[in-house]
């Protein structure tokens, strides 16, 4: 009976689900032994360092990972960096197949002036900072201004904006990093804008996350009702199901505004950032809008506009992902998950 030795590089969700797929292929005619190699001391990738701490239910998938790891012929080698401590070619010489499952950990850039100022961060840095990722404990996160801007129209952007706009005591029962809780408790931020380049009908938020926003106990959530009405007209009589769900959720927020709280999270649509203003640090953002340029004064800008893969020596990359054809990179080398997309 053929027995295949497989190395999986990366111990995040993609790596574990690749291992599970191999385990499910095992039968009386073939078997697999799986060695998972992780750069960090702990596994689970984004489930550990990328999920908003106030959404603990998402982390229950770790129980699935534990079940996968407890299967026969599975081993985890943590604290080992592929590309420096061991090369891809060395792995290929020792295994029948090598699977790259390292995810996409680098934040995409806006490519506008001022992006390198102090107070301009990527969500790829900010999110692991508040999630206790060992690489990001010392990140400079200035929260001393009263206004922050989050650029992006997906759930990561919404998570970041929500974390900034929450009453910090709400984070005490969560597994938010202690250094982050301390920083949030001393934060001066009271207004958070979340800005999207296109209209509400194009936003990549998901409706369950949008429907949670009115439940925030200490935060006003503001959406311009006219923006949503215009988006509903643009979406047409039969919009896609996800678009309709999003617009319905946003309209509900827009029609039931709150203003009694000290903290506010406000959505801005059709706002394209042109420049981040400042001399030594962030002082504002200039946006292009359908009604002309608009400047928002702020002391913190966090971009959440997508991710790209971190390169590994010996693996071909292009446009922030591993070069592949249907997951195959080259002979005996494959890629899965965000590093593939």
Question: What do these predicted ranges mean?
Answer:
Residues 97, 101-108, 154-155, 298-310:
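Glycine-/small-residue-rich beta->alpha transition segments that form the dinucleotide
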Residues 119-137, 276-277, 281, 292-341:
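FAD-site-proximal beta/loop scaffold in flavoenzymes
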